[in-house]
């Protein structure tokens, strides 16, 4: 049996309100706030900068209105943490062990050939260095606030070092190998997963990571731990980061096969899988009832308040409200603040994860 009571299955239950009460000093020390009782806002494609005007013109001439969702930019991660009080980030990761795959993208070459006036691209030459790179689509949608995974992790770590009382920060890592051009990204298999974990550990030491082993404890499986005593208390893991593998299917299965129980990333699997602790349910409209059941049973769920810019273009808040009401702990958005070109649409939670630090 769990040491704490199950959360009430009601639409008005607000995890963030519980956080605010604890921070205000009204918590019961015998029943500490658990990590799965948080509700945190984060961004989708958190590194993304919209293509420049020249690139949007080229892409629109080929794909028409399908490129509209690309016209979305995020602030630097530090600003998202500080001003936006966002606590989870999605990063698209490409292998690049030699530093040669993404340093000279087609769309930048076309702009140079045309003499187009575009913002500088990779002025420090970071893409020519070996290491995992962050971008949305090779050659085409390449602008980013962080060119490398190392720099993104280091930026968040620096903020964390200065604000060690923060609740755990979640990184959702999507391991990508797709391309629409002649660039051929490397597959995620074999030693690639060790490379990923080494890059993480080079920035975030093990004692600052909330890993599956920390949740599993002495239970036989991660699922047994979550279904039994539940996720650990927030206060035991302040100042830490947790890493979630966004991929499901074959990439996830290869990661599980290539790593041990001491792996650093949580994986999204079926609820009866031994490694079940979090699940990705991106559509809160279609899976509302399922999300509520998963949350009620102690699993962490990530869902999306909007997708492809549709909600922002029409100022449609239904999906946003359902995402919040579902109780999903990790809510992602492309619009933590309004885009004045589109509408007033944006996503904000009723209560912050912690007081402002500015």
Regions found by a protein language model. Name each.
Residues 3-16:
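Bacterial N-terminal signal peptides that target proteins for export
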Residues 1-6, 26-30:
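Basic/polar N-terminal segments that are highly enriched at the extreme N-terminus
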Residues 14-24:
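Bacterial N-terminal signal peptides
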Residues 28-358:
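Catalytic cores of phosphodiester-bond hydrolases, prominently lipid phosphodiesterases
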């Amino acid at each position: 049996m769990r040491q704490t009571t199950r959360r009430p299955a009601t639409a008005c239950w607000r995890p963030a309100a519980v956080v605010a009460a604890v921070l205000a000093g009204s918590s019961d020390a015998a029943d500490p706030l658990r990590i799965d009782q948080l509700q945190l806002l984060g961004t989708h494609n958190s590194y993304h900068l919209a293509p420049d005007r020249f690139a949007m013109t080229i892409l629109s001439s080929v794909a028409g209105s399908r490129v509209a969702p690309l016209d979305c930019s995020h602030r630097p991660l530090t600003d998202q943490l500080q001003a936006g009080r966002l606590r989870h980030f999605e990063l698209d990761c490409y292998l690049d062990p030699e530093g040669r795959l993404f340093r000279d993208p087609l769309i930048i070459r076309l702009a140079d050939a045309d003499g187009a006036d575009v913002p500088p691209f990779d002025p420090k030459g970071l893409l020519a260095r070996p290491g995992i790179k962050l971008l949305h689509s090779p050659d085409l949608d390449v602008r980013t606030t962080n060119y490398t995974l190392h720099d993104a992790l280091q930026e968040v770590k620096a903020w964390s070092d200065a604000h060690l009382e923060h609740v755990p920060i979640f990184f959702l890592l999507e391991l990508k190998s797709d391309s629409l051009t002649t660039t051929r990204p490397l597959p995620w298999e074999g030693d690639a997963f060790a490379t990923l974990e080494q890059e993480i550990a080079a920035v975030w030491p093990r004692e600052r990571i909330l890993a599956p082993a920390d949740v599993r404890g002495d239970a036989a499986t991660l699922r047994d731990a979550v279904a039994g005593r539940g996720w650990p208390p927030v206060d035991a893991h302040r100042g830490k980061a947790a890493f979630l593998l966004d991929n499901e299917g074959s990439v996830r299965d290869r990661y599980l096969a290539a790593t041990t129980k001491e792996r650093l990333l949580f994986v999204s699997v079926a609820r009866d899988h031994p490694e079940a602790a979090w699940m990705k349910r991106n559509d809160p409209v279609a899976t509302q009832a399922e999300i509520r059941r998963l949350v009620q049973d102690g699993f962490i769920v990530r869902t999306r308040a909007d997708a492809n810019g549709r909600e922002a273009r029409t100022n449609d808040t239904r999906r946003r409200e359902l995402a919040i009401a579902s109780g999903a702990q990790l809510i992602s958005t492309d619009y933590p603040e309004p885009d004045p070109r589109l509408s007033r649409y944006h996503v904000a939670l009723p209560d912050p994860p912690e007081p402002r630090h500015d």
